[in-house]
Amino acid sequence: MLQQRTIKTLTRAVGVGLHSGQRVELTLRPAAPDTGIVFRRVDLPEPVDIPIRAESVVDTRMASTIGVGGAKVHTVEHLMSACAGLGLDNLYIDITAEEVPILDGSSASFVFLLQSAGVVLQNAPKKFIRVTRPVEVREGEGQQLKWARLEPYHGYKLRFEIDFAHPAVDSTGQSVEFDLGSGNYTRDIARARTFGFTKDVEMMRASGLALGGGLDNAIVMDDYKVLNADGLRYDDEFVKHKILDAIGDLYIVGRPLLAAYSAFRSGHAMNNRLLRELLAHEDAWEIATFESERQAPSGFAAPVQAW
């Protein structure tokens, strides 16, 4: 049986929110089988649980935000990407502010935290959402076109293409394909950082956003080049971060996907639209479990490689 996973012991992190600049503490705790991933706003007078699911997404401007009632948690995608990359099904995430800390701008710190806590198997079958027919969302035309698609696939692979007319981006790969079953998430994807332009950062800060952003937690570019002294972590770090984001955005569906995802210029909003489009058509998906590892997609039974 392909089993569900949680962490062995609790672990903690402290950082600042990318947009709020607020200090925030995270406590990641083990959870029982079939709990799913649940954020808990412990800073409120009465703690509020916000479970991860597509309909919990209440805002997709600049990040993926989930909420219940008036309680929200912003910028969940990097932590969700780490959970997906490690195959974690069940987790409580206690948080003391309304935004997940940005840490180094990638998923690497979250992967390290979770692997340090230990990943353990649970006595319950892992439940996948298996895509059974193609689902697509599109927006715009010509140079404004963007789209995202899910198609049937015995496994989970992602292909993303970006289109940035910038010298620093043009000199790197604008498309990448990654198969989560390879077991190479930590090596090939997790370290890819969020990126932005100095002119956009200045405008965002004037609007009260990106207050916690800087060269230590993002790739920052002027009109011509990357400003970070250490350069890029991957030759194609820009598009790999888009894959990282997509893995996190799509994990908000609440279960691991079995599908081939492809996208052109997609972002948080379109990824969530794609999930909602999928769930709205009951003939497009089904719940799948695997009684034997031989039936399961390649690589899904093995633990993800450590650093």
From Swiss-Prot:
The keyword Ubl conjugation does not apply. Catalyzes the hydrolysis of UDP-3-O-myristoyl-N-acetylglucosamine to form UDP-3-O-myristoylglucosamine and acetate, the committed step in lipid A biosynthesis. NCBIfam families: lpxC. GO terms for biological process: lipid A biosynthetic process. Belongs to the LpxC family. It holds the Pfam family LpxC. One of its GO terms (molecular function) is UDP-3-O-acyl-N-acetylglucosamine deacetylase activity. Its EC number is 3.5.1.108. SUPFAM superfamilies: Ribosomal protein S5 domain 2-like. The active site is at residue 268. GO terms for cellular component: membrane. This is UDP-3-O-acyl-N-acetylglucosamine deacetylase. It catalyses: a UDP-3-O-[(3R)-3-hydroxyacyl]-N-acetyl-alpha-D-glucosamine + H2O = a UDP-3-O-[(3R)-3-hydroxyacyl]-alpha-D-glucosamine + acetate. Its cofactor is Zn(2+). It comes from Paracidovorax citrulli (strain AAC00-1). Pathway: Glycolipid biosynthesis; lipid IV(A) biosynthesis; lipid IV(A) from (3R)-3-hydroxytetradecanoyl-[acyl-carrier-protein] and UDP-N-acetyl-alpha-D-glucosamine: step 2/6. Keywords: Hydrolase, Lipid A biosynthesis, Lipid biosynthesis, Lipid metabolism, Metal-binding, Zinc. Zn(2+) binds at residues 78, 241, 245.
